[in-house]
Amino acid sequence: MFKRVLTIATLAVLPFAPKGVSAQSNCGTKLYCLIPTAFHTTSSTFNFFNDAFGTQISQLPLASPASGFIYSFDKSGVYTASSESFGPLLSERSETIGRHKLYFAVTYQRFAFSEIDGNDLKHIPILFYYPNEQSPTVVTSTENRVDTKIDQVVAFATFGITSRIDLSVAVPFERVSMGVSSNGSEFSTTSTASASFHEFLAGSASGVGDVVLSAKGTLVKHERFGLAIGTEIRLASGDANNFLGSGTVGVKPYLVLSRRGMVAPHLNVGYQWNGNSVLAADENGNQPLPAYFGYAVGADIGLKRITFVADLLGEHYFNAPQISQPESVSASVNNQSMSFSSVVRVPSASYDADNLSVGIKANPVGHLLVSANALVKLNDGGVRARVVPLIGLSYSF
């Protein structure tokens, strides 16, 4: 019977991995290495899973940095709060906060990821073998579970430079917790020898995420309609190897069209560009994180001290990593072909990640706002949580 040490030393790479990549169990102590270490592979061997994880959990949605209170001069020349609602939560409206006005906010979100491309993260079958080697010695069939949770606290500040231009900063603080378990069976390709194993690894990391700087300017300001443009710049301030950040700078120009009133519809469209990141690395080095086209369409309904908000949020990712549903994969065991159930890499393509956001903003006193929101997934693209709760406090000066 072959030894466990020999098995680990000769563990096979995935069907889609490049030839010549050798498996190792010593990847490192960062969360980026947790999954490949549990599976006894290198991070480059298993980067299809880390790519998918990194694309999503390093670019978590943030609440809007726009103030719930909008100030402007009324017809009599008095500078006063002019909005009939407190605005959206996860999207923008065209109005700016007002000249020399200041806004602070803090939000908390919890992400409990449950699926990846429609696959339950509690049950991920993966087959490891050497399809390109002339004499592979080991085939390993595994059933895997990946538990990932992120607690995110974000501090926001917005300042009105002029009556038409706002500058904002968002500083996220995150705690990422991961647990990876793998149950597997190892088979000799030339004999009846076999062995079973179980691995469990857990880890966590805390720290500052990627800081986001943004500017928004109102282009058109009519009595009821407004048009604004803006740009977000995401800094690579978070530790990408611990999934606290994306590992690269990102730029997102966007356009906002909205209507003012008790019922205030709004439309946001934007394009997120990302640079090269370790989270998308392959045998040729760091590669770009997938870009995406994002949109938000919805409305907020303002009452005297309460605003109800609903948005359809969508992101269309380009050239993004995905994994398949489990399919039959054949490998040689005891010199005979045997079929195993396994997910495999889907060649980089496009997919959509759509969510429904429903929330409320309440004004208990003064210029204080209390917010609550639920982000509900509508489809299966990417690494997803079924529901993401949000609570927040904000104050305008």
Regions from the PLM with identified roles:
Residues 25-168, 172-209, 281, 322-341:
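A subset of solvent-exposed loop/turn segments in beta-rich extracellular surface proteins, enriched
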Residues 86, 98-100, 149-155, 202, ...:
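Residues that define the transmembrane beta-barrel architecture of outer-membrane proteins
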Residues 90-93, 104-108, 155-161, 169, ...:
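Residues on the lipid-exposed face of transmembrane beta-strands in outer-membrane beta-barrel proteins
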Residues 108-114, 171-177, 210, 219, ...:
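Transmembrane beta-strands of outer-membrane beta-barrel pores
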Residues 113, 164-169, 222-227, 261-267, ...:
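Repeated loop/turn-to-beta-strand initiation elements of outer-membrane beta-barrel proteins
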Residues 116-121, 180-186, 229-230, 239-247, ...:
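Outer-membrane beta-barrel translocator domains and adjoining extracellular loop/strand segments
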Residues 124-128, 191-197, 286-397:
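Outer membrane beta-barrel transmembrane domains
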Residues 197-249:
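Hydrophobic alpha-helical segments and helix pairs
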